[in-house]
């Protein structure tokens, strides 16, 4: 599907460690890293390719030319779109997709689409298992570093930080 409907609206595209490793291998990661983030919407950290604040659509979508800038190496989620897999069955994740019911699909194309949906599912399961652990390790380390820094501060410096935090809350 290459109509751009999904690409121009989605603000956070799920990505996996497999996507990131492939982009590193293919020399694309440096250009994408500023758009890779962590989404906490579901309660657990998930890797995403996201637009900058205030921008709409996938950051890799060129809305003027209606093209994906990384079409040759797009995220697994995009390769499978609009097909998804949940571990037991395949389903259409976006029934509003303009490509549904348009043209024909042969057995080989269907197999490719199904494989992409399964690859996306498996890669995201792996990433979604590891990201929360890595997030916890990194956040724990940051808290420890902050605590150690606070131990070396004077009472006056600590009071200044508390004042700043109070101002931020108001």
Stretches found by the model and what they are:
Residues 1-170:
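Short loop/turn segments that flank or connect secondary-structure elements
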